[in-house]
Amino acid sequence: MRAIIETVFDIFYLVTVLTVGIRMICGSKAGTQFRLFGLMAVVLGAGDSFHLVPRALALCTTGLESYAMPLGLGKWITSVTMTVFYVLLYYVWRKRYQIEGQQNVTAAVYALSAVRVVLCMMPQNQWLTNHTPLAWGILRNIPFALLGLLIIVLFYHSAKQNNDKAFRWMWLTIVLSFGFYIPVVLWADVNPLIGMLMIPKTCAYVWTVLIGYNAMKAETGKQN
């Protein structure tokens, strides 16, 4: 039953974010915040598919243990694409609120992203095995969490300052995604049921994408 529920949910998630992302790309002008948002959604869905598709196959066939290499490779790829996702989200923030300058913030985003990617590339992660070291799981997620925290602060203050009702909950979607993700990193190996928190984490990302899509529809409607 768990295999069926997870598989159906993952298919729904991937189809939703990829469809919304493609529609945003096709329905927006080049160089706009919504074109960037659409690209961000496609990166999210495409990156997650490298992990979720092998996971669905594993759950519906011989089990996770038999798919250690494709699952590990998928997690590896996803760890990088999620970093790219937040870099793109940072530029959505800059475009939406017409931010000029603030090179220190940009430098921090790139520095945290670079450290995260470098840590993900280290062989000590043992991505392609069934048992990845917890210490490295924590280590590579420290810069990722700091990057997320920075994006949370930026969207919270800018949405509040500009009375941006469309994006007023963007910061909360990121808080929720990390809130559900961190326990999985820390304790999923001890208690596999904690891994189920990835479902509400995924829902938080769907909310993120829908915020951008609904804002695009609303603002396009006003222009017409």
Question: Where in the sequence are the language-model features?
Answer:
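Hydrophobic transmembrane alpha-helical segments in integral membrane proteins
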Residues: 1-18
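Non-cytosolic membrane-interface motifs at loop->transmembrane helix junctions
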Residues: 3-6, 64-76, 129-142, 191-201
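Alpha-helical transmembrane segments of multi-pass integral membrane proteins
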Residues: 39-53, 74-91, 103-124, 139-151, ...
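Membrane-interface helix-boundary motifs at transmembrane edges
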Residues: 26-37, 93-105, 130-133, 156-168, ...
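Terminal transmembrane helical module of multi-pass membrane proteins
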Residues: 171-217
